[in-house]
Amino acid sequence: MYENELKRILNGDEKTLNKVTKSMNDREKEAYLSMIKYPFIVIRSTGSLGIADLVAIRSDLSMLIEVKARSSNKIMFSNESGRVQRAAEEMWKQCNRSGVMPIFAFRMKGYHGDAWRLFTLKVSSLSGKAKEVNKIIPKLSITKKMNFYMVWEDGMKLSDFIRIINSVGGKSPSERWGMITDNII
């Protein structure tokens, strides 16, 4: 369900964008609606490839995206017999091999406003925009036992991510992130 929502957002589907932005502030809404002009081709893997739920591709950026949705603010990857942890490790390995950015998208159920938060892992083989963007997205947290976890509040808003990747004017993603955080703080 939420995989399809994120797929349609990144694909610039106007009907979905109008629906999900109803409870957002103007800044968040503006960012989401920019996906109409700068869409991705997004492929949803049925039954999951074991690596990711979505593959998003456009001329300047490619991403493997794992989608999680919860009504609580924390996701422990070690739950579910370690299946999620193993899948995240495999996704990181494949992204390092291929130079593709991994994204872990956490949707808070029942939240009004921008309900999506993004996380990533450091990937040394990235180049161009992906390398710059990967530096500024919060990384997955790691427990003492070396298992990943996400705390929703620690992630980057999807609207901020979209604003960074869709901005024009020649500024680097890190410069745009500075502009965004200046407006937040």
Description of each model-found segment:
Residues 7, 88-95:
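Short amphipathic alpha-helical segments and helix-helix/interface helices
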Residues 25, 74-76, 142:
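Phosphate- and other anionic-substrate recognition elements at nucleic-acid/protein interfaces
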Residues 47-68:
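Active-site beta-strand-loop-beta-strand hairpin of nuclease catalytic cores
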Residues 79-90:
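Substrate-gripping "pore-loop 1 plus following alpha2 helix"
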